[in-house]
Curated annotation (Swiss-Prot):
Residues engaged in binding substrate: 50, 159, 235
Cofactor: Mg(2+)
The protein's name: Oxaloacetate decarboxylase
Role summary: Catalyzes the decarboxylation of oxaloacetate into pyruvate. Seems to play a role in maintaining cellular concentrations of bicarbonate and pyruvate.
Organism annotation: Pseudomonas savastanoi pv. phaseolicola (strain 1448A / Race 6) (Pseudomonas syringae pv. phaseolicola (strain 1448A / Race 6))
A molecular function GO annotation: oxaloacetate decarboxylase activity
Length: 289
């Protein structure tokens, strides 16, 4: 079978988001997982920022991975991927000028779409919730991303977090990002369909939801009716790989019992050592957390 080009895959992604259906992403974190996802019939994959941090650095999701490290992983995936892959490009690795560089590099890597979020990063230790940048700065980042794009087939999605801001602010952000020219809007933290209806009113571009498996949003037909074209439940495949690796190596060492009771979440916490980063934040950033 002929290999699809990067532009072919970008056109495929645009066809998905122009349809009347909602598609669920495969967690794609390396070339092998990209091939598996395509072979199993997934229409779209996603390289998560948090997963890339785990895969490349064995580090927690504290915005520690650099653009070059993320792009290197995306490039490895782009060499073999035969399904469109979305890159979770976090905050674009800096200001609007950094966003432009991010878009250029990820486009060269072969990514079909990317998301730019309005989260204030790196992590603001010592705060109860994650802050967002101003809407004006978020709009500037989207405009910069569109300016930097060379292939018009690559999709640029703006992303915001509806869980930590009032509904009216979420509506305003979504509408302003749409007006700035974003090809789609990614929303994290939607509670239920009523919440989605409020925030998506007036949105005409495709929606992507990051649901983390929220059972209130499991009606795929209803999601599609409300304009959701891509749904990200999380990265279960990656965490299953962590668990399988641990159990296999543990068995090879003939440690008592062939299986461990530790969950993938517990293993991830153990081996990313987040307490070290919290301690460094206390020590060097005058943070009490």
């Amino acid at each position: 079978m002929p290999k699809a080009s990067h532009q072919d895959l970008r056109r495929s992604f645009r066809a998905l988001t122009s349809s009347n259906s909602c598609f669920h992403t495969a967690s794609v974190f390396d070339p092998m997982s990209a091939r598996i996802a395509a072979d199993l019939g997934f229409e779209v994959g996603i390289l998560g920022g948090s997963v890339a941090s785990l895969q490349v650095l064995a580090a927690p999701d504290f915005a520690l991975i650099t653009l070059s490290e993320f792009v290197e992983q995306a490039t490895r995936i782009g060499r073999v991927a035969q399904l469109p892959v979305i890159a979770d490009a976090d905050h674009g690795y800096g200001n609007a000028l950094n966003v432009m560089r991010t878009v250029v590099e990820l486009e060269r890597a072969g990514i079909s779409a990317l998301t730019i979020e309005d989260t204030l990063l790196p992590a603001q230790f010592g705060r109860k919730s994650t802050d967002l940048i101003s809407t004006a700065e978020g709009v500037g980042k989207i405009r910069a991303a569109l300016e930097a794009r060379v292939d018009p087939e690559m999709s640029i999605f703006a992303r915001t977090n509806a869980a930590i801001i009032p509904v009216q602010e979420a509506i305003s952000r979504v509408q302003q990002y749409q007006a700035a020219g974003a090809d789609g809007i990614t929303i994290v933290g939607i509670r239920d369909f009523d919440h989605l209806a409020q925030i998506s009113e007036g949105v005409t571009v495709p929606l992507m939801l990051v649901t983390y498996g929220n059972p209130e949003l499991h009606d795929n037909a209803r999601l599609a009716e409300m304009g959701v074209r891509v749904c990200v439940h999380g990265h279960a495949a990656y965490f299953a790989a962590i668990k399988a690796t641990y159990d296999c190596l543990r068995e090879q060492r003939q440690i008592l019992g062939s299986e461990s009771n530790m969950s993938a979440t517990e293993l991830t916490h153990t081996y990313t050592q987040p307490e070290d980063y919290v301690e460094w934040a206390r020590k060097f950033m005058n943070v009490n957390e």
